[in-house]
């Protein structure tokens, strides 16, 4: 019988141990304690980050929002009907990211960046974090370039600049979305990329908006992010941040982008729902204490960044170009109450507001912009020269007209000067009316404002102002196309352009009918 050598045995065992392939991995796992209303409580998870993605069986993901002593409260992203008590949940070590890039232009995606338009996968896109810190003070640049909305009343009186946050506020069904969509349509040839975020809207409404963008040739330049009314509160809360990340892709690479949040009232309601289900203490109107921070950290990401920021971000690939992300948040008020919690918050965060009024809308003044309450805190710095020069008296005329109209109801005999002011105000009010999906070019707008400013409307009947304006613009585009093209390209105002406009209008009034 062969004798076993102890040293041999130890060598064999040692060799086996050295060759053993140990492929075990450390996993941070916990157990689902409860599932209800899209909120999951998990016990046993350690080292979880706030906002970290948590993976559940069946490819379902959640996001950690409440980090308590003995449990984690997470919100489910999507359907949660497959989850049950006792299931395992594991940390991923990642925060939520969405696809970004030019491949998304012309597409409709959900809040997580998944395409929902039936046009196939997005292709080779990169991803970026949904929650990002806004650029610091040093990296910002002052706003001095315009974003043309195509609306006379906005571009003349409440100008919006690249990198500005301009709130559109008003009651339901008075043209807030229409104004934002027209602003997007007007960017199709301006080189500004657009992102439209629909929060809590009906799917039929969103489908109609997408169709209108396509009909007007603006969809190819736009990303549509949808978290419809039928989707979970978590997705409605995340959609604006996802859209903002998609817009920042362009800003950080020296491009200009415009983002519309339609609307932030519904995002605040969704966040309130999540917070109450997570048992956070309610505050005013049952909103949580951090609802201001919800909107401020989103809207602060809209900015104009300097050449140095773009150069540093792109590692020198893009030089000498500033980038901007302009935000048009929409807030819906109840019976014109702008002093409610969410409206006052957003008014204080933004750089001005366009206030739409129900009474004006119902009396046929559309867009129903109340020039007295609306303001742009960037102002003339972001206006083209010709519009800035010609729009000075428009706001004053409208403000004086409103004041005098109220006074004139009680006074029977008015002096000549007051009567002239009233008549001029009526004509300017009529001139500010504009059809939907018909944004105007700088030259068309300048022509209308010039006619009002220089008194060419005095002898035109109020009821015929609209047809006069249409005929005048058609006449100039036909007979003075060179002058109109010059205004559109440069936007300057000098004696030559002044003389050309004056002579053209005088000729039109002498030879044409309207």
Curated annotation (Swiss-Prot):
A GO cellular component annotation in the UniProt record: proton-transporting ATP synthase complex
CDD domains per the UniProt record, alphabetical: ATP-synt_F1_alpha_C, ATP-synt_F1_alpha_N, F1-ATPase_alpha_CD
Location(s) in or outside the cell: Cell inner membrane
Site (Required for activity) residue list: 374
GO MF term set: ADP binding; ATP binding; proton-transporting ATP synthase activity, rotational mechanism
Domain of life: Bacteria
Keywords recorded for this protein, A-Z: ATP synthesis, ATP-binding, Cell inner membrane, Cell membrane, CF(1), Hydrogen ion transport, Ion transport, Membrane, Nucleotide-binding, Translocase, Transport
Class of the enzyme per the UniProt entry, highest EC level: translocase
Primary location recorded for the protein, binned into one broad class: membrane
EC number(s) stated in the UniProt entry for this protein: 7.1.2.2
Membrane topology field: Peripheral membrane protein
InterPro entries the UniProt entry points to: ATP_synth_asu-like_sf (IPR023366), ATP_synth_asu_C (IPR000793), ATP_synth_asu_C_sf (IPR038376), ATP_synth_F1_a_nt-bd_dom (IPR033732), ATP_synth_F1_asu (IPR005294), ATPase_a/bsu_AS (IPR020003), ATPase_F1/V1/A1_a/bsu_N (IPR004100), ATPase_F1/V1/A1_a/bsu_N_sf (IPR036121)
Binding site for ATP: 170-177
Family named by the database record: Belongs to the ATPase alpha/beta chains family.
NCBIfam families: atpA (TIGR00962), PRK13343.1 (NF009884)
Binding partners and assembly: F-type ATPases have 2 components, CF(1) - the catalytic core - and CF(0) - the membrane proton channel. CF(1) has five subunits: alpha(3), beta(3), gamma(1), delta(1), epsilon(1). CF(0) has three main subunits: a(1), b(2) and c(9-12). The alpha and beta chains form an alternating ring which encloses part of the gamma chain. CF(1) is attached to CF(0) by a central stalk formed by the gamma and epsilon chains, while a peripheral stalk is formed by the delta and b chains.
Job of this protein: Produces ATP from ADP in the presence of a proton gradient across the membrane. The alpha chain is a regulatory subunit.
Protein name: ATP synthase subunit alpha
Organism: Pseudomonas putida (strain GB-1)
């Amino acid at each position: 019988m062969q004798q076993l050598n102890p040293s041999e045995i130890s060598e064999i065992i040692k060799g086996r141990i050295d060759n053993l392939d140990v492929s075990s991995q450390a996993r941070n796992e916990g157990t689902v304690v409860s599932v209800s209303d899209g909120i999951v409580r998990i016990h046993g998870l350690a080292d979880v980050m706030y906002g970290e993605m948590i993976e559940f069986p069946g490819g379902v993901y959640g996001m950690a929002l409440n980090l308590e002593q003995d449990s984690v409260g997470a919100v489910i992203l999507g359907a949660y009907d497959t989850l049950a008590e006792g299931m395992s949940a594991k940390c991923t070590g990642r925060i939520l990211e969405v696809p970004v890039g030019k491949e998304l232009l012309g597409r409709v995606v959900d809040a997580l960046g998944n395409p929902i338009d039936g046009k196939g996968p997005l292709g080779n896109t990169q991803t970026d974090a949904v929650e990002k810190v806004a650029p610091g003070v040093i990296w910002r640049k002052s706003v001095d370039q315009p974003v043309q909305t195509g609306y006379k009343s906005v571009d003349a009186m409440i100008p919006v600049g690249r990198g500005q946050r301009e709130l559109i506020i008003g009651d339901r069904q008075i043209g807030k979305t229409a104004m934002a969509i027209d602003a997007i349509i007007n960017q199709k040839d301006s080189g500004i990329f657009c992102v439209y975020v629909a929060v809590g809207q009906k799917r039929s409404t969103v489908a109609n908006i997408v169709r209108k963008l396509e009909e007007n040739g603006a969809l190819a330049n736009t990303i549509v992010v949808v978290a419809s009314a039928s989707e979970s509160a978590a997705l409605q809360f995340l959609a604006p941040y996802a859209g903002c990340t998609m817009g920042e892709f362009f800003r950080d690479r020296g491009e200009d982008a415009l983002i519309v949040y339609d609307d932030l009232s519904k995002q605040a309601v969704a966040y309130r729902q999540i917070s109450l289900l997570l048992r956070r203490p309610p505050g005013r109107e049952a909103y949580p204490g951090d609802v201001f921070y919800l909107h401020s950290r989103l809207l602060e990401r809209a900015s104009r960044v300097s050449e140095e920021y773009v150069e540093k971000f792109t590692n020198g690939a893009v030089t000498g170009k500033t980038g901007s992300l302009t935000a048009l948040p929409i807030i819906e008020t109840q019976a014109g109450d702008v002093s409610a919690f969410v409206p006052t918050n957003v008014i204080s965060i933004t750089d001005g507001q366009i206030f739409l009024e129900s009474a004006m809308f119902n009396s046929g003044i559309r867009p129903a912009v109340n020039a007295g309450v609306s303001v742009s805190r960037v102002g003339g710095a972001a206006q083209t020269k010709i519009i800035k020069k010609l729009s000075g008296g428009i706001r004053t005329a409208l403000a004086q007209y409103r004041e005098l109209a109220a006074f004139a109801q009680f006074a029977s005999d008015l002096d000549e000067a007051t009567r002239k002011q009233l008549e001029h105000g009526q004509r300017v009010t009529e001139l500010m009316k504009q059809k939907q999906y018909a944004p105007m070019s700088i030259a068309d707008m300048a022509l209308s404002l010039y006619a009002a400013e220089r008194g060419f409307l005095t002898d035109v009947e109020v009821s015929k102002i609209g047809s006069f304006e249409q005929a005048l613009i058609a006449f100039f585009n036909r007979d003075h196309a060179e002058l109109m093209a010059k205004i559109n390209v440069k936007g300057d105002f000098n004696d030559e352009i002044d003389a050309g406009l004056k002579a053209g209008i005088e000729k039109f009034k002498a030879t044409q009918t309207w």
